Amino acid sequence: MTSIQTFTSFTTSNCYVVTPENNSDVCYIIDLPPDVEPALEYVRNNNLSIGGCLLTHGHFDHSLGMEKADGKIYINLDDEFLARNPQEQLSAFTNSELEVQEYTGELNDIFSFKNENIDIFSNPGHTKGSISYEFKNLGVVFTGDFVFAEGIGRTDLYSGSLSEMKDSINNIFLSFNKDLEVFPGHGNTDTVNNILNYNSYLKGFING
């Protein structure tokens, strides 16, 4: 059966295990936080196979679990440096003493990933390589740190851009079907329609 399971990290980032098709044991993991183990345990306990680990961007709270992950990892290669070098980010996010090192495993270009039921959107702003994933048969979109239910991603970190965020909101987010349910990188879900109506941060970026 189709399902979306949410696992929230101690970093507050959301990891999702998505089983998009009935009568299929193939799942997709959206983002790989440092403590990704519960998501991987869910996959094993339910005898699922991983069709791909799809990263929304390269920040450590969404990618530091790459060493632990099974399955091919896909990312916009504009964020490859961020994903491979988490030590460059930690001081900007947290005072915790996470043990990190450069990731040397394989990273696959997200634009080489092919699935007719999954649309891939490039929405730079939070990072240069930020991506959203729409699972068309489920009526949902995973936005990472692009847009939240009550906010938008910050743009003052490495490769972030305020002007690109504005362009992405107007050209990508406004193109989404208003009935889509948004599953963000942090916080709760909501519909595109509700976010457009009540997210004051996002509304400030919409062209008049």
Which positions does each model-derived feature cover?
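Conserved N-terminal boundary motif of the eukaryotic protein kinase catalytic domain
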Residues: 118-119
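Active-site HxH/HxHxD metal-binding segment of metal-dependent hydrolases
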Residues: 34-113, 201-204
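Active-site neighborhood of phospho(di)ester-bond hydrolases with catalytic His/Asp-centered motifs
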Residues: 29-30, 51-59, 73-76, 122-125, ...
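Conserved beta-strand hairpin/beta-sheet module of binuclear metal-dependent hydrolase folds
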Residues: 1-46, 132-144
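Metallo-beta-lactamase
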Residues: 122-208
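Short, glycine/acidic-enriched loop or turn micro-motifs at the edges of active sites
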Residues: 22-23, 34, 60, 79, ...
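Short Gly/Pro-enriched turn/cap motifs at secondary-structure boundaries
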Residues: 6-8, 102, 122-124
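Short acidic-hydrophobic surface loop/beta-edge motif
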Residues: 7, 18, 108-115
